[in-house]
UniProtKB/Swiss-Prot annotation:
One of its GO terms (cellular component) is cytosol. Its EC number is 2.1.2.9. Residues 210-315 are annotated as: C-terminal domain. It catalyses: L-methionyl-tRNA(fMet) + (6R)-10-formyltetrahydrofolate = N-formyl-L-methionyl-tRNA(fMet) + (6S)-5,6,7,8-tetrahydrofolate + H(+). This is Methionyl-tRNA formyltransferase.
Length: 315
């Protein structure tokens, strides 16, 4: 039975904590937890434990917080736990080859895409921005490459027209634990069927940046609408007005052709703020000026109508 496997869990954020919680709830034997060191957070920059550490300590599990797993003494921490398998979910540290080979069944990772599509740091956001019809999770055997290991199990889910990275994150945080528990059972039973990734289908999900989230009006309205959903809740798509950043929370596409230059404000009314793009019109519905809460376009127009005079251009 898979419950007899000795499991090391390595993860840091809430996404990882949900997987650890599922392992514990289903009776798995977690013999140690690795998570990143406490980090300063909040206005007071007080040291805060990761969600994984909080859960592990609540459950009385041994917690290890090395800055790196490269030093020999830190690798020894892993070796001494004599694990059958190490489960890695959004840990944030590189596992050296020596660590990958320590557990009897190796190390497995939960990745937030249908590999080999979207290897890398931001698979949820990139799948949304690209307009993919579906995404999912892949449980894979880890090797020294970046998300290059053999695939053990996949679960998929559709991407809807309303999904943001936040909602998709929640969907995958439900799927991931299901796939993980199934995979552990298959590893324990000897029924897992590793599948080599097709290198011809590989795409890369590069890390997001705040500058990348700046709205580029030369893109199509459809691309920008997906970008706004992909970058919500972080880093949030934004535009600049009078030197101030204004976040965009929600927009829609108006399928009407326009000859106006990209960035030109066409209309500003209770239906929204309509802006010309490289292809089509983007209707801004919910915005957030610096230092304010998110508000409807109508509410923003009531206080800042001078920002959105038809004929003016947003840059």
């Amino acid at each position: 039975m898979s419950e007899s496997l000795r499991i090391i869990f390595a993860g840091t954020p809430d996404f990882a904590a949900r997987h650890l919680d599922a392992l514990l709830s289903s009776g798995h034997n977690v013999v140690g937890v690795f998570t990143q060191p406490d980090r300063p957070a909040g206005r007071g920059k007080k040291l805060m434990p990761s969600p994984v550490k909080v859960l592990a300590e609540e459950k009385g599990l041994p917690v290890f917080q090395p800055v790196s797993l490269r030093p020999q003494e830190n690798q020894q921490l892993v070796a001494e736990l004599q694990a059958d398998v190490m489960v890695v979910v959004a840990y944030g540290l590189i596992l050296p080859k020596a660590v990958l080979e320590m557990p009897r069944l190796g190390c497995i990772n939960v990745h937030g895409s249908l590999l080999p599509r979207w290897r890398g740091a931001a698979p949820i956001q990139r799948s949304l921005w690209a307009g993919d019809a579906e995404t999912g999770v892949t449980i894979m055997q880890m090797d020294v490459g970046l998300d290059t290991g053999d695939m053990l199990y996949k679960l998929s889910c559709p991407i809807t027209a309303e999904d943001t990275s936040g909602t998709l994150y929640d969907k995958l945080a439900e799927l991931g634990p299901q796939g993980l528990i199934t995979t552990l059972k298959q590893l324990a039973d000897g029924t897992a069927k590793p599948e080599v990734q097709d290198e011809t289908l590989v795409t890369y999900a590069e890390k997001l940046s705040k500058e990348e989230a700046r709205i580029d009006w030369s893109l199509s309205a459809a691309q920008l609408e997906r970008c706004i959903r992909a970058f919500n809740p972080w880093p949030m798509s934004w535009l600049e007005i009078e030197g101030q950043p204004v976040k965009v929370w929600k927009a829609s596409v108006i399928d009407t052709a326009t000859n106006a230059a990209p960035g030109t404000i066409l209309e500003a009314n209770k239906q929204g703020i309509q802006v010309a793009t490289g292809d089509g019109i983007l209707n801004l519905l919910s915005l957030q000026p610096a230092g304010k809460k998110a508000m409807s376009a109508q509410d923003l127009l009531n206080s800042r109508r001078e920002w959105f005079v038809p004929g003016n251009r947003l840059v």
